[in-house]
């Protein structure tokens, strides 16, 4: 086999491996999140310590920075944070004390990982659960039922809640965006983070390519480069082999089971893309998982003492 044949064979082999890895990622993702769409699970929620507020959270482990989130932000403990996979996921929390709390609860988006001091862990063991959500005082007060003052609820500091994952809903003009991380170096080293990921979804794969390459040219197919999640920061996608810009991108979006490609129509990153900048992809993510609860989900969620818990609807 000549040198050109070797190169083409290597390209084909790399593509096959990438597709196999993508399949495994999508399947694993579906299995891990299938129970997110079922009946609500039980947890506790507490108020973030003063003077922590929303700006501190958006600068936390998820690295959203100064980007306006439009939703109440929350920090979650490690088991729910999932090494960063939960960044940008939306949840509905409803206090279980009907004397104090209303039916609608509060909707939050995950922006940080909550650290749990030893004394708080002890407090929540006696409360019957592990601390999983921390929210701002304003978000905590939003759970109060009509006729209950914000002060009356917030003085509780910690409450037991039902929680479930829900679709993220941003205003109509808000589309999926990418933030170029500070560690990026134009042109080859690129690290990005997604913002305003709507629906009830996870991003399972990301690829970038030169925006000026069009099918059926060979450069269109050969210029696509896959990105990988950064170790220790799954919300960041990175590559050291980025093509010269301007760049377009495509992503695999999963919603509980299966996945689909979404591809930008044109340029997303300009040739002179810069670290710290946010760029609009032109894509709108609205997929919602089909509510089909497996037996394993039902067993996982049947943790009440009397077996007659009210389902969060």
From Swiss-Prot:
Glycans are attached at residue 124. Belongs to the expansin family. Expansin-like A subfamily. Residues 59-173 form the Expansin-like EG45 domain. It comes from Oryza sativa subsp. japonica. One of its GO terms (biological process) is plant-type cell wall loosening. This is Expansin-like A4. It is found in: Secreted. Residues 1-30 form the signal peptide. It holds the Pfam family Expansin_C. Keywords: Glycoprotein, Secreted, Signal. GO terms for cellular component: extracellular region. Its main location: secreted. Residues 188-281 form the Expansin-like CBD domain.
